[in-house]
C-alpha cells in the first residue's frame, strides 16, 4: 500500500501544528572580567543586590555591586573554571540557606552543603541569609539567664537569652574555649547552638567538633565551617548563614545560641572583596560600611515578646585583638554594637588564671536583669572585692609593712581569684556556683591556704551532693537565698571545714 504525496503533506502539516517548543526566557549576561573570587558581568541590568547568579558548571555567585554598565559579583565557590565570555543567568532569588531541625548534629559550609560525609541534608525550608532584624514592638527586654557554666562569667558578667555579648582578646587567650564551654553547658536546656567558624584552620574546627561530640553536645549543635582555605566570599557570608539557621528556631518560639568565631576574619574577608570591587577604602583600608556589616548581623539577635512566640537568639561574637589593643577599629565597632564584653588577657592566661577574664573592663549591660536572685545575692560583693584587691595588690608591691585590714583584704582577694579558676570543658551548674562563691565572699576560705582552695571546692561540692543535696535542690528551685537557707548553707560549710584536711 503506497501513500499519496498529498497524504504525506497533510501528516507533516498536522505534526507542525501540534509541535510545541517550550520557551524558556532567561535573563542572561556575559562575564567580562574574572579573578580573585570576583566577576564583572555585562548585560544583567535587572539584577538585584544580593541576588544569586548561576555560572556554568553549577557554580553560583552573589551580586554585590550594581553599576551603570556592569555588575560586580562575588563567586561562592571555586572560580578557576570561570572564564571571560561565559554566560551567566539570573535566578531571581536572594541567596538562601537550608534551615530546620535536619541540620542539627551536622557540619555544613556557608551554603548549607554537608561537609561531614553523613549524606545529604533534606531540609524542608530555606531562609535568605540577609533578613531584617525584629522591630522594637516584637522584642522584649532580656530577662532569662543563659548559663555559661563558668563561675567568673555567670557571677560577674552574666548573659541573658537574647543578649549580644562580645568575647574579645588576643590570640591564644581561650576565647574559643569559653564559647565551647558555653555550648557544652546548654545540654538539657532546650537551646539549639550554632557554631560558625570563620577563617579558622581546618584542624582547629575538627578539634572543636570532636570535643562537642565527646561531650554529647552535637545532639543540639550545628557547625557552619568556612575554613581559611575557602575563598573570601564564603567567609563573608558564613555568619549571616549561621544567623539565618538560628532565626528559624527564634521564630518558632525556641531558644538558639549563635557563636561567631571570629568576626575579625570576616571583616578582613569583606575588606578584600570591597577593594577588589574598587569600593573606596576608609580607616585601616576597611570600606565605609564595615560598621553596618556587623551591626546588621548582631541586631538580628533578640528576645521576642510572648505575642510573637517568646523565642530568643543569643549572639556571642568573638573578636581577636592585636597586642591587647581594644581601641582598634573593628574591636571598638563591635563593642559599641554589643550589650557588653568579656575581655580575656594574655597576662592573666599565662599567670595561670583561666578563664583569663579581666573583671575590671568586662561588663554585661543587660545581663544583670537575667541573673538569678541567689547569684545576685552572693556575687554583688565579688566584683567590688576583686577590684579593691587588684588596686591594693598594685600598691602592695611597693611597701612591705601593711596594716591588718589591708593584709586581710589581700588574702581574701587571692582566694577569690583562686576560686574563680576553672578547668576547660568542666562547666558548673548554677546552684553549685552559688554555694562556692557564697563560701568565698563570706570569708570561709580566709584561713585555707591559697594552694588548697580548689581542693576545698571539689571536696565541698562532693559533700553537698552527697550529704546536703536538699540545699542544692532548694537553690535550684527557689533561685534565691532565704535566711533559713543561708543559715543551713553556713552550717554545711562549717561542718565540712571541720572534716577538711588539706
From Swiss-Prot:
Keywords from the UniProt entry: ATP synthesis, ATP-binding, Cell membrane, CF(1), Hydrogen ion transport, Ion transport, Membrane, Nucleotide-binding, Translocase, Transport
Binding-site residues for ATP, renumbered to this chain: 169-176
Entry function: Produces ATP from ADP in the presence of a proton gradient across the membrane. The alpha chain is a regulatory subunit.
Subcellular location(s) per record: Cell membrane
Site (Required for activity): 362
HAMAP family: ATP_synth_alpha_bact
InterPro entries: ATP_synth_asu-like_sf, ATP_synth_asu_C, ATP_synth_asu_C_sf, ATP_synth_F1_a_nt-bd_dom, ATP_synth_F1_asu, ATPase_a/bsu_AS, ATPase_F1/V1/A1_a/bsu_N, ATPase_F1/V1/A1_a/bsu_N_sf
Protein name: ATP synthase subunit alpha
Entry's family note: Belongs to the ATPase alpha/beta chains family.
NCBIfam families the UniProt entry points to: atpA (TIGR00962), PRK13343.1 (NF009884)
Pfam families, per the entry: ATP-synt_ab, ATP-synt_ab_C, ATP-synt_ab_N
Main location: membrane
Amino acid at each position: 500500500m503506497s501513500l499519496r504525496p498529498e497524504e504525506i503533506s497533510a501528516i507533516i502539516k498536522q505534526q507542525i501544528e501540534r509541535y510545541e517548543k517550550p520557551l524558556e526566557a532567561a535573563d542572561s549576561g556575559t562575564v567580562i572580567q574574572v579573578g580573585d573570587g570576583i566577576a564583572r558581568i555585562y548585560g544583567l541590568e535587572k539584577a538585584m543586590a544580593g541576588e544569586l547568579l548561576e555560572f556554568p558548571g553549577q557554580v553560583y555567585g552573589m551580586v554585590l555591586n550594581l553599576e551603570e554598565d556592569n555588575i560586580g559579583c562575588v563567586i561562592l565557590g571555586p572560580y578557576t573554571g570561570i572564564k571571560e565570555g561565559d554566560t551567566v543567568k539570573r535566578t531571581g532569588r536572594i541567596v538562601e540557606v537550608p534551615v530546620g531541625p535536619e541540620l542539627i548534629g551536622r557540619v555544613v559550609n556557608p551554603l548549607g552543603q554537608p561537609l561531614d560525609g553523613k549524606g545529604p541534608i533534606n531540609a524542608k525550608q530555606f531562609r535568605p541569609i540577609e533578613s531584617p532584624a525584629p522591630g522594637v514592638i516584637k522584642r522584649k527586654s532580656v530577662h532569662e539567664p543563659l548559663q555559661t557554666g563558668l563561675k567568673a562569667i555567670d557571677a560577674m558578667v552574666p548573659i541573658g537569652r537574647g543578649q549580644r555579648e562580645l568575647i574579645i582578646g588576643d590570640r591564644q587567650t581561650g576565647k574559643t574555649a569559653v564559647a565551647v564551654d558555653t555550648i557544652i553547658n546548654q545540654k538539657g536546656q532546650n537551646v539549639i547552638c550554632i557554631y560558625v567558624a570563620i577563617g579558622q584552620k581546618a584542624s582547629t574546627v575538627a578539634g572543636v567538633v570532636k570535643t562537642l561530640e565527646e561531650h554529647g553536645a552535637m545532639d543540639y549543635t550545628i557547625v557552619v565551617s568556612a575554613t581559611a582555605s575557602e575563598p573570601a566570599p564564603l567567609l563573608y557570608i558564613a555568619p549571616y548563614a549561621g544567623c539565618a539557621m538560628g532565626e528559624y528556631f527564634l521564630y518558632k518560639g525556641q531558644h538558639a545560641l549563635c557563636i561567631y568565631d571570629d568576626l575579625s576574619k570576616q571583616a578582613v574577608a569583606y575588606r578584600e572583596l570591597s577593594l577588589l570591587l574598587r569600593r573606596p577604602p576608609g580607616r585601616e583600608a576597611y570600606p565605609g560600611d564595615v560598621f553596618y556589616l556587623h551591626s546588621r548581623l548582631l541586631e538580628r539577635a533578640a528576645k521576642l515578646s510572648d505575642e510573637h512566640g517568646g523565642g530568643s537568639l543569643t549572639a556571642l561574637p568573638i573578636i581577636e585583638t592585636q597586642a591587647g589593643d581594644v581601641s582598634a577599629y573593628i574591636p571598638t565597632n563591635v563593642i559599641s554594637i554589643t550589650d557588653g564584653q568579656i575581655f580575656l588577657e594574655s597576662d592573666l592566661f599565662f599567670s595561670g588564671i583561666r578563664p583569663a577574664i579581666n573583671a575590671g573592663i568586662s561588663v554585661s549591660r543587660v545581663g544583670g536583669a537575667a541573673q538569678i536572685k541567689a547569684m545576685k545575692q552572693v556575687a554583688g560583693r565579688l566584683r567590688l572585692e576583686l577590684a579593691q584587691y587588684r588596686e591594693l595588690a598594685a600598691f602592695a608591691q611597693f611597701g612591705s609593712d601593711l596594716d591588718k585590714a589591708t593584709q586581710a583584704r589581700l588574702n581574701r582577694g587571692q582566694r577569690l581569684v583562686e576560686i574563680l579558676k576553672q578547668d576547660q570543658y568542666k562547666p558548673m551548674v548554677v546552684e553549685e556556683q552559688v554555694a562556692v562563691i557564697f563560701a568565698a565572699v563570706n570569708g570561709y576560705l580566709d584561713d585555707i591556704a591559697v594552694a588548697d582552695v580548689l581542693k576545698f571546692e571539689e571536696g565541698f561540692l562532693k559533700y553537698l551532693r552527697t550529704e546536703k543535696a536538699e540545699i542544692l535542690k532548694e537553690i535550684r528551685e527557689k533561685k534565691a537565698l532565704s535566711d533559713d537557707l543561708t543559715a543551713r548553707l553556713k552550717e554545711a560549710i562549717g561542718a565540712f571545714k571541720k572534716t577538711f584536711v588539706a
